[in-house]
Amino acid sequence: MKVRRRRHTLLPQALLLPAVALFLLFTVAPGGYAIYLSFMKQKAGGGLFGTDNPTTVFAGLENYRAAFGDAEFWHSIGRMLLVAVVGVPATIILSTTFALCLDAKRARLVGFSRLAIFLPYAVPGVVATLLWGFMYLPATSPIGGNTVNYFGSHMVFFSVANVAVWGVLGFNMVVIYTSLRGLPRELFQAAELDGASELQIALRVKLPMLAPTLTLVTVFSLIGALQLFNEPTTLKPVTNAISSTWVPLMRVYTDAFVDNDIYRGAAASFLLIVLTVAATVAANTVLRLVARRSER
Amino acid sequence: MTAATTGTASRAAAGSGGTRPGGPHRTNWIPTIILLVGAVYCVLPVVWIVIASTKTNSELFSSAPFAPSFHGGFFSNLRALFAYDHGIFTRWAVNSVIYAVGGATLSTIVCGCAGYALGKYRFYGSVWLFRVIVAAVLLPQIMLAIPQFLLLAKLGMTNNYAAVILPQLVSPFAIYLCKVYAESSVSDQVLEAARVDGASEWRSFLSIGARLMTPALVTVFLLQFIGIWNNFLLPFVMLNRDNLFPLTEGLYGLLIITGGQAAQYTIVIVGVLVSIVPLAAVFLLLQRYWRVDLVSGGVKA
C-alpha cells in the first residue's frame, strides 16, 4: 500500500481558504485596526469649532494613560469582577450539583428536571434579562419586589449575576453530566462494595474525575463573565442603579458611540482583550495545577 | 437497569453500616428534591411570563402574580404587539431567522471544511495554523465587535445583513470540534479505499467525509444557531435602522421606548413570550439530535 499514499492535492488548502480569509478579515484585521486606532487621536482642524478637516495624528500612549488614570474605568472593572465573584462559583457549584443529582441512583423526575434546567439556554440573554427585569421591578414582581430592593447598591450585583447564572446553568450542567456518564461505572460499584455512601462516591470518586471538564466549564464561565454587557445594558432602562459605564464593555461602547471618541474606546477594548487572555491563561494554569494535585 | 444490577450491592453496603436505607425501588429523595428546586428556579420566570401575557395592563399591576386572567387580555396584547409600528415585530422575527439560519448554515460549512482539512491532512503550515485558531478561542469574539464595527464603518459596510452574518462565520471552537471529530470518526482506511477505487479527493470528502461528520456538523449548526440568535452586541453596534433589527434588538428598543411608561409593559411581555416559544420548541424537538458529549469530549483529547 505504499503506492502514492498521498496524491498531490490542493483540497485541504481550498477547504481552509474561506475560514482563513474570514479569520483574517474579521478577527486579525479588526484587532490590528483597534491597536492602530488606540495609538492615534483626533486633532482639531480649522473653523469656528475646530471641526473642519480634523486630522488623525499619532498620540503615543496618551489613550492608554487616560484609561489607566481614569477611576471610572477601574470602577467598571471592579463591578464586573464583583458580578464574576458571585456568578462564576454559583454557576459551577450549581451545575455540578445538579449533574451529580441527575447521575444519583434512584433519583426521580430526572428527565423532567434536566429539560427544565436546560430550558433557559434557549432563551436569548436579552430576553432573559427582560424576564428577570419584570421579576425585579416592584410594580410587576412576583417574587416580592416590594420588600426586596433588587436594585439596591449591594443587591444589584446579585441581581445581575442571577440573570447570567440562570442563562448558562443548564448548558454547563449537561456538559458536566455528559462527561460524568462517560466515566467507567465499575469504579463506582467498587467504591460501593467498599462501603462508600452515595454522597462519598459523588464527592470522592466522581468529582475528582470531573476535573478536566470542570476546568473547561470554569474557563468558559470566566470568559463569559469578562464579556458582561447584555444583562446590565438591558436592565439600565429600568433602574438608575446601572450607569452607562457600569461594566468595561459598556464603557467602551459609551466611549466609542456616545462620546464619539473611538480612539479611547479602542485603547480600552484592547486593554480588555489583554486582560481577558491573561485571566484565561491564569485560570487554566491554576486549575490544571489543582487538578494535578488532586490526582495524587 | 443500574438499580437492578446493583440492588444486592447496595443492600450489602447498607448491611455493613452504610447510611442508605431501602431497596432498589425506593426514591432517593435528596437528589430528587435538589433537582426539583433547580427546575422550579429555571422555569419560574417563564411560567410567570406566560401568565402575565394573559393580563391586561391594569390587571398586570393589580392581580395576583401567578393568577392567569381570562378577560381576553392575551389576544388584545398579541394584536397590539403585531400592530405596533405597522407590524415591525414580524419583520424582526423574519430578520432573526435570516441571521440565525443563514449564519449557522454558512458557518457550519466554513468550519466543517476547515476542520476536515485540519483533521485529515498534514501539509506545510497546517499544525501552526491549527494552533493559531485554537489560541483564538481565548479571544472573545464579542469584544471584537467594536473594532469590527470601526473597520467595517471605515469601509462603508455596516447597516446590512452581511455586517451581522460575516463576522460570526468563523468559530474557533467549531473548527476545533470538527477537527477532533474528523480525526476520530473519518477513518483513513475508508478514504484510502475510495482513493483506490479512483475517487477524487473532492469526491471522497463530499460523499464520505462530510457524511461521517454529520453528528459534529449538526452540533455545530445548533451551537451557532443559538449563538447568533442570542447575540446582542454585534447587531447592537452594526445596525442603526430598526427594520434590520433581530428580535433581541427590537425588544430592547421596545423596552427603552416604553421604559418610562408602564402602560406599554404588556406589549413587551407578550413580545418576550412570542420570541421564546419558537426557539424553545425547536430546541426541545432537536435536543436528542445534538450531541453535547462532543462539546465535553473535546477536553479529554
Give names to the regions the model predicted.
Chain A
Residues 8-296:
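A structural signal for multi-pass alpha-helical bundles of membrane permease subunits
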